[in-house]
Amino acid sequence: MQPDLHCRTLAAHTLKHFRALSPLTHCMTNDVVQTFTANTLLALGASPAMVIDPVEARPFAAIANALLVNVGTLTASRADAMRAAVESAYDAKTPWTLDPVAVGALEFRRRFCLDLLSLRPAAIRGNASEILALSGMALGGRGVDTTEAALAALPAAQALAHQIDCIVVVTGEIDYVTNGQRTLSIPGGDPLMTRIVGTGCALSAVVAASCALPGAALDNVASACCWMKLAGQAAAERSEGPGSFIPAFLDALYHLDVEAANEEN
């Protein structure tokens, strides 16, 4: 099936709901991106919480609006905490999102991520290599970098979405968002987004938060991708390199006006 281009008018409408709701988003993410992830959510209007201790993670996941599990700096004790949080979210019907960082490169995290799939994530966000590995169609990938184009992983994403009954996002130069039956494409962004640590991980947090919104999950998640792409483009226009890009990106998220960007394009 051919992907449809996501509608920016819908993304603008979804952003208004996102800012009004300010989803409380429980982020169990990796150590490298904690601050950037929290600031990204705050800039867009969400409420981040970085609760990681197993004793606290289980009850907190039940009261949050959404949960993110990012396995970038996975340890055995952190896996226990994540598993407890996901089980709690599952029982409470809290939508949770999996970011399977480098899942094809390391066996411990691969087995952990595959085990979590039985607890029905609302969304999975990864690059092409990660989605191919998680679907069982390929193993490998060099850490968080992708060795495949997003389009090459689209059949794997569609199959995984159909199998798990969730939304799968494959990110790249063009992002693809699918529920297994319908697929949306989101172009845009800027190469500078790949020259700093954490844009993909932060997107996963925004995807998680968007899953807390009412309405069609596919459209909400595609809107999240659109917001990040537009902010990346705007930030790149006023940046000289990676160092100035980060604050410009956060400012662009804070001031994001999807309707105005739509008129400019």
Curated annotation (Swiss-Prot):
Family assignment from sequence similarity: Belongs to the Thz kinase family.
High-level lineage: Bacteria, Pseudomonadati, Pseudomonadota, Gammaproteobacteria, Enterobacterales
InterPro entries: Hyethyz_kinase, Ribokinase-like
Name used for this protein in its record: Hydroxyethylthiazole kinase
Lineage: superkingdom: Bacteria
Cofactor: Mg(2+)
UniProt function note: Catalyzes the phosphorylation of the hydroxyl group of 4-methyl-5-beta-hydroxyethylthiazole (THZ).
Stored Pfam families: HK (PF02110)
Catalytic activity: 5-(2-hydroxyethyl)-4-methylthiazole + ATP = 4-methyl-5-(2-phosphooxyethyl)-thiazole + ADP + H(+)
The species this protein was found in: Salmonella choleraesuis (strain SC-B67)
MF (Gene Ontology): ATP binding; hydroxyethylthiazole kinase activity; magnesium ion binding
Keywords from the named record: ATP-binding, Kinase, Magnesium, Metal-binding, Nucleotide-binding, Thiamine biosynthesis, Transferase
